[in-house]
Amino acid sequence: MKNFLISLILLLVVCTAQLWGQANTLATVTGHVVDENKEPVPGATVVITNKSTGFSSGTLTSADGEYTIRQIPLGSPYSIEVSFVGYGNQTRSNYTLNQGDVLRVDFQLSESPVVIEEVQVVANSMKKKAANIGASTSVSARDIATMPVNGRNFTSLIDLSPLSDGNNLGGQLQSSTNYTIDGMTAKSAYSTGTSNRGPYSLSMEAIREFEVVTNSYDVTMGRAGGQKGEVMKKIIKLICFVLAVSMIAVIFCGCKGSGVVLATYDGGEVLSTDDDGQRTDDPYSVSQFGVTLSGAIVKDRLHYFIAWDQQYDSRPLEIADINGPEDEDRLGIKKETLDKFLQIARDQYGVSDSPQVGSFGKKRNSTSLMARFDWQLNPTNLLTVREIFNRDMDNHGTDDNSNINLYEVYGSNLSTDNSLLATLRTIVTPYATNELKVQYLYQMDHGFPNELLPSSNIPRAIVENVESAGSLQLGGQRFLPEQFKNHTVQAVNNFYWDTDKVDYTFGADVQVQYLNSLATSEMNGRFYYNGMEAFENNTPYRYAREVPVGDPTVKQTVLNSALYAQGKLGLFKGADLTVGLRGEYTYYFSNPEENPTLKQLMDISTANKVKGFQLQPRIQFSWDINDQHTDILRIGGGIIGSA
């Protein structure tokens, strides 16, 4: 028994140190209603209303006078009204709800009506965030507006987490980081990062709040920690991470009519240096501008929000731009050596007579568009439709890993993604709420060789041991051409049921991905030359190439699904225990091809079905000591990963 307790304590300590994420994109309001004698008032009506959008939701107090309203859209100003037969109505106003807030508002009813027009903001900001203290780092829209965020990329806000080193969290792989927007997947299906390779995948003006959640054990979140690795290797990890971005429905909360914001930024003269800090006379500019529109289409019923961001990036591409002895020292190569390499390349290897080294104009154009509509269908149903479109054209932005690559080596990449999301929030009963989300996500990455080369690419020549320069390269490159297309359909349904003793959550998350991939990395072949003389005599010492078997295009259909249930029990004042179970199932519809030679010689089959199932029990204890929102103890653990 003693060893079991020690093991359990160690497990909980380890689990709380790991990275897990939750995308609680909405807020919760809870409280206690009593009468003048401080006795509970059961059956009192509690209604919360957003005075800016007209959204409203309500519930009834329990036998103990407790009430909870879940899945409330973020924004302000909110008012809360309590009414009961025989007592005057009591109203409290001017509340702001941010991502993951659990706002507690208690009422004491009297015979006379009471209206509190303004709620003072106190210095203790833990009051609403007590449920997330120690679990997340939150950045509000106001913080975002005042922070000098470079490039207006919301993912750079991850650096505000104490667990971030700029590339990962807590020392984990970047591929373990999941990204969600409005609680639905926004992660690239092929690599790390978001679904778009551009400088940003969402206008900064469209972000209500950004949250880095690293220590929570809610069953509604999963499918992280590098889902592809887990499927293939069937590894169970205790490490996951989710970035949740929740977008504002109407960004000008409390304003009448429509709102318009114009944002511009231009960097030019002061930034005119290359990557090594050397001054360049070539045109250099990074211009960003955008517009946001918001307002009511039908007052208190239908509202819209539109955000558009555009970036024009014109920074020169510097390739061995030698204009004097200082450049030779900096680059580690003499101009005569470089000229000789170019002459041989043109005379014997067919390199174009157009410039291959120097300073080249390089342009990158990026567009981000978001539109959102919130429609209060009736007092019990809120429908939200949201569209995000991104396009990034990065010309000559893909190089290879030799020390000096000629201009013809540099390829381009076009990245496009489109996300259409519909959310329906329904009040089933005064004690039950259902939220259904359905998303279609399209992602396309198309990389293609330089305009000086054939579209199918050509082999490359790598000349090594060239003085102190290391290696020089001409021809094609390892990555291009490539093309990745991903169609994702995701449906998530969460049902919240509050009882006198336990708050239940039941849900399902189903995601189907259709992947079409053409990855030609290292398939074009490469010749290695030991020095300039061998290059001139065309005597390579090595040739290497990864040869595809058949069509290199890979088509896959993947099912990722999950069922989960959770109960939250109040133990005593300020303390609660949450216990949940999540089951994840992953299935690849297409089988790998059989290798008959391997099967015959070693009786090893390569045509095995790829699938996996994983049960993930989770538990968390939270104690707000004395219910003062100043001292909070949280212990949790569980299995977290992907099937």
PLM features: what roles do these ranges have?
Residues 88, 94-106, 117-231, 258-278, ...:
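Periplasmic N-terminal accessory/gating domains of Gram-negative outer-membrane beta-barrel systems
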Residues 123, 257-267, 306-310, 385-389, ...:
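Transmembrane beta-barrel strands of outer-membrane/channel proteins
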Residues 177, 206, 257, 300-304, ...:
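Outer-envelope beta-barrel architecture signal
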Residues 20-122, 129, 230:
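Periplasm-facing N-terminal accessory domains of Gram-negative outer-membrane beta-barrel systems
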Residues 230-231, 282-393, 415-434, 438-440, ...:
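Transmembrane beta-barrel wall of Gram-negative outer-membrane proteins
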